């Protein structure tokens, strides 16, 4: 569960390393975001000489959370870190690679481009 002021790692090669959530999108006053939700984040740490710089405001989709996710078949899935992929206004990732596993629930939310770039889908 991601809420404002939560730190995440960037799971792509867009140039950001650390992100901080500042808003959960979707609904008036949503408190938490889960896998597949879109957030507004600020870049706290980045790679030099890349278009995405520190203190830039970006939209990102959450691909991994430490909080377990209950599936309909009764299985619980959780990851070692909280991670997000930076997206543009169309919902496509700004980077060209995605690092680490991502959850299958992204396919239900129409983030198929992220699914195709990921090395492993759980």
Curated annotation (Swiss-Prot):
<dbReference type="InterPro" id="IPR019972">
    <property type="entry name" value="Ribosomal_uL14_CS"/>
</dbReference>
<keyword id="KW-0689">Ribosomal protein</keyword>
<dbReference type="GO" id="GO:0022625">
    <property type="term" value="C:cytosolic large ribosomal subunit"/>
</dbReference>
<comment type="function">
    <text>Binds to 23S rRNA.</text>
</comment>
<dbReference type="GO" id="GO:0070180">
    <property type="term" value="F:large ribosomal subunit rRNA binding"/>
</dbReference>
<dbReference type="InterPro" id="IPR000218">
    <property type="entry name" value="Ribosomal_uL14"/>
</dbReference>
<comment type="similarity">
    <text>Belongs to the universal ribosomal protein uL14 family.</text>
</comment>
<keyword id="KW-0687">Ribonucleoprotein</keyword>
<dbReference type="GO" id="GO:0009842">
    <property type="term" value="C:cyanelle"/>
</dbReference>
<dbReference type="GO" id="GO:0006412">
    <property type="term" value="P:translation"/>
</dbReference>
<keyword id="KW-0699">rRNA-binding</keyword>
<keyword id="KW-0194">Cyanelle</keyword>
<dbReference type="GO" id="GO:0003735">
    <property type="term" value="F:structural constituent of ribosome"/>
</dbReference>
<dbReference type="Pfam" id="PF00238">
    <property type="entry name" value="Ribosomal_L14"/>
</dbReference>
<comment type="subunit">
    <text>Part of the 50S ribosomal subunit.</text>
</comment>
<dbReference type="InterPro" id="IPR005745">
    <property type="entry name" value="Ribosomal_uL14_bac-type"/>
</dbReference>
<dbReference type="InterPro" id="IPR036853">
    <property type="entry name" value="Ribosomal_uL14_sf"/>
</dbReference>
<keyword id="KW-0934">Plastid</keyword>
<keyword id="KW-0694">RNA-binding</keyword>
<protein>
    <recommendedName>
        <fullName>Large ribosomal subunit protein uL14c</fullName>
    </recommendedName>
</protein>
């Amino acid at each position: 569960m991601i809420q404002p002021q939560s730190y995440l790692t960037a799971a792509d090669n867009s140039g950001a390393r650390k992100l901080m959530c500042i808003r959960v999108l979707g609904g008036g006053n949503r408190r938490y975001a889960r896998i597949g939700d879109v957030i507004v984040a600020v870049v706290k740490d980045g790679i030099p000489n890349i278009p995405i710089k520190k203190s830039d405001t970006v939209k990102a989709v959450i691909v991994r959370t430490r909080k377990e996710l209950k599936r309909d078949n009764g299985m619980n899935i959780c990851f070692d870190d909280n991670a997000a992929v930076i997206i543009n206004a169309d919902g496509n990732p700004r980077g060209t690679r995605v690092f680490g596993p991502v959850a299958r629930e992204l396919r239900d939310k129409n983030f198929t481009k992220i699914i195709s770039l990921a090395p492993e889908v759980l």
